[in-house]
Amino acid sequence: MTREEIENQIVLGKKNLKEELKSFFQEHSFRRIFLVAGSSFPKLPIGEELQELFSKLGISFYHFSEFRPNPRLEEVEEGITAFSDFQGDVILAVGGGSALDTAKCIKLFTGLSKDRPYLEQEYRENDIPLVVHPTTAGTGSESTPFAVIYQDGEKCSVEHESIYPKYRIEDARSLRSLPIYQKKATLLDALSHAMEAIWSKYSNEDSRAYGQKAISLILTNYKAYLSLENKNDAKVQGKASSAEDPSQAVLESIAEAANLAGKAIAVTKTTAGHALSYKLGSIYQLPHGLATAMVNRALYPFMCREKCRMIHPENLLFLAKCFSAETEEEGAKRYLEILEDLEIIPTLSVKAGDLENLVAAVNPERLSNHPIALREEDIRLLYKEILGGK
């Protein structure tokens, strides 16, 4: 996507969240809202406020929560049936990447034939409005035309400009109550997006600008973000201004970083840091952001060593400067220091055959955005390092 297309998104909640949402639903005359959100939705600050608003405006809503992390195709199909039965006039997604990706696919597939597998059909635009609100700071799905679902245990990438959300609700309060482990894992996903959009073969001025700003916000705020007390009490009910609650500025900065990193990969798509992470995460049950960080932990120094093979090697120096480093190698070192500081990289229980299973599972097409053409021996070397030399 181009920067112009990305920035056409309409953002709600920049000033007065409640009033902006009220005006939005009234102006569009939405009467039947199909809500895609996890079971914790009613307990979220924005969940309570939306339910109160729906009641005041006489809006009916159906809460679809029948999906798991890393949503399955069959769960999306259940959502399509529920949306059709409810006859909703808008889809509202509230949650992390799984909720948003599920909603995106419900929107996209609803316009397709039920007589053929959805993933095999040609996608097309439809006029179902899609409103999203991310409650984590990592995937950036609120600002990308991508979704990820799984079929028979295999990752399926869905891409179409129709699922780039036209409307985004901005409200960072939910980040405060995330478990510390989830804060770290999602933060690493955002950082991976920003890094990969900078070194991508298709990196351009826009993706680098988005990525640079995202990394700056993360490095400036991540320690304060992780030190915030994990709570969701009356003190944080109602969107406080940064002046009223200085910690709100930290939450908003982290949310902005994840959003900018999402915009960055909307321009370039992801690279080997993601392509090599999916099977790794599946085998060892790792959160997606952590899996990408474990790959990039090996990949970033590898790229510094092999920069003579790289398309646009100057992007590595640009990335290094984002980490306040003067050389490519020093940039990679700074990244590794951040991972060490987070104390989240696990020791994997590697079984015989895992290495070859990982190497065999990589689809070369997913590596097409990477600035170095990775050979099988490169991939094996990287996985061997990721697995701890096993």
Regions found by a protein language model. Give the residues of each.
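Gly/Pro-rich interdomain helix-loop hinge
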Residues: 283-357
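ATP/NTP phosphate-donor binding region
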Residues: 1-90
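A glycine/threonine-rich phosphate-anchoring loop and its flanking beta-alpha core
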Residues: 111-206, 214, 310-314
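Short glycine/serine/threonine-rich phosphate/pyrophosphate-binding segments
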Residues: 19-20, 43-46, 73, 98-103, ...
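Short Gly/Thr/Asp-enriched flexible loops that form oxyanion-binding sites at enzyme active sites
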Residues: 50, 80, 99-113, 143-144
